[in-house]
């Protein structure tokens, strides 16, 4: 997995989020659908070439594997930045979902807990929209999580929010999201959002 070119790569720049934490601007994405153990060699290689930011999610069903590899890496926990995400069918139960993720990762804390998508789905039916809860209500639960799980979650944020949804959220947020993790590439250029 690691090539000499990768091993000589420079460590990516970091940015400071609103909590004061430094986050690598390049993270190792752990999405590997249908094969949780299949991500292990990639994470092992990433730890050896200097990645410090690891991104997983409840949806990926590999939080256990991510945590296992990171603990075995020998990298001090404070040198790592671990992001995981609340899945769409857990918008009604943010705290319970967070606890499951923390237990699966088996780490002392999670650096960043994101709302994976603004649209909730019916529990157990990940593709059926649930309009009984708004992303604003879900965000309020995430804000509460910062209080009830102080020290166990360092920052909260969102993922896949558009300018419209982010603007709406900011009208109601007491805590500004520390991150809006988005997909961007030549075939998906949301220039207004990236600005």
Please identify what each model-predicted range represents.
Residues 2-6, 192-195:
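Short, intrinsically disordered, charge-balanced linker/junction segments flanking boundaries
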Residues 5-80, 95, 108, 144-147:
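N-terminal binding-site loop/beta-alpha segment at the start of enzyme catalytic domains
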Residues 26-37, 85-93, 125-131:
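Active-site mouth loops of central-metabolism enzymes
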Residues 28, 54, 66, 82, ...:
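Conserved, mostly hydrophobic/aromatic
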Residues 35, 118-195:
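Beta/alpha (TIM)-barrel catalytic core signal, keyed to glycine-rich beta->alpha loops juxtaposed to Asp/Glu
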Residues 39, 63-73, 94-103, 158-175, ...:
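Distinct, well-ordered alpha-helical segments
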Residues 77-90, 112-118, 181-184:
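A short, structured active-site edge motif that brings together acidic residues
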Residues 91-139:
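Glycine/small-residue-rich loop that forms an oxyanion/phosphate-binding "nest" at active or ligand-binding sites
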């Amino acid at each position: 997995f690691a090539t000499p070119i990768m091993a000589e790569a420079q460590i990516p720049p970091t940015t400071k989020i609103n909590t004061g934490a430094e986050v690598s601007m390049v993270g190792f994405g752990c999405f590997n659908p249908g094969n949780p153990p299949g991500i292990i060699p990639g994470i092992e290689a990433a730890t050896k070439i200097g990645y410090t930011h690891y991104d997983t999610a409840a949806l990926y069903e590999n939080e256990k594997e991510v945590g296992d590899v990171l603990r075995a890496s020998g990298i001090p926990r404070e040198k790592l930045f671990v992001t995981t995400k609340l899945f769409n069918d857990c918008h009604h139960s943010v705290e319970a979902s967070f606890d499951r993720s923390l237990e699966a990762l088996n780490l002392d804390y999670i650096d960043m807990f994101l709302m994976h998508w603004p649209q909730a789905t019916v529990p157990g039916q990940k593709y059926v929209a649930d309009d009984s809860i708004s992303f604003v209500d879900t965000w309020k639960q995430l804000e509460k999580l910062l209080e009830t799980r102080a020290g166990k979650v360092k920052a909260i944020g969102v993922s896949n929010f558009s300018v419209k949804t982010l603007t709406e959220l900011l009208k109601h947020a007491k805590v500004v999201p520390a991150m809006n993790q988005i997909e961007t590439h030549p075939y998906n250029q949301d220039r207004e959002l990236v600005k």
